[in-house]
Amino acid sequence: MGKPAAERRLSENEAQAFARLIRSSPRKLNLVAQLIRGKAAGEALALLTFSKRRVAGEVKKVLQSAIANAENNHQLDVDRLYVSHATVGRALVMKRFHARARGRGARVEKWFSNLTVVVRERADEPVQEAAE
């Protein structure tokens, strides 16, 4: 548990953004993160905009922040960005008590999650000329 032994270093064509303590379970948040993994940044934003899941708004904010970091801090071309990593991790769990019948009680767990989004600039693909 805890942090990995070696932190992941970003290359020159990458930018990232974090969100800590998102009020959603990691399992539900990962469903939305799977939607955007490997997609172009514009396409991922469109998917999140029209997603019916409540947590999609939080993921969209983090993705927009990663895109802004790429543009302003790393001078990357926004049109060539894609989501290379979207990582979901467990954060704290709040324990609550729910009163039940006959003097009993039930434990309610309110899960929190962390989200990391890394965007990468696509490399220039060599243009192949048609052989005549």
UniProtKB/Swiss-Prot annotation:
Belongs to the universal ribosomal protein uL22 family. Gene3D superfamilies: Ribosomal protein L22/L17. Keywords: Ribonucleoprotein, Ribosomal protein, RNA-binding, rRNA-binding. GO terms for biological process: translation. NCBIfam families: rplV_bact (TIGR01044). This is Large ribosomal subunit protein uL22. Disulfide bonds: none annotated. This protein binds specifically to 23S rRNA; its binding is stimulated by other ribosomal proteins, e.g. L4, L17, and L20. It is important during the early stages of 50S assembly. It makes multiple contacts with different domains of the 23S rRNA in the assembled 50S subunit and ribosome. The lineage of its organism: Bacteria, Pseudomonadati, Pseudomonadota, Alphaproteobacteria, Rhodospirillales. Pfam families: Ribosomal_L22. Part of the 50S ribosomal subunit. GO terms for molecular function: rRNA binding; structural constituent of ribosome. PROSITE patterns: RIBOSOMAL_L22. GO terms for cellular component: cytosolic large ribosomal subunit.
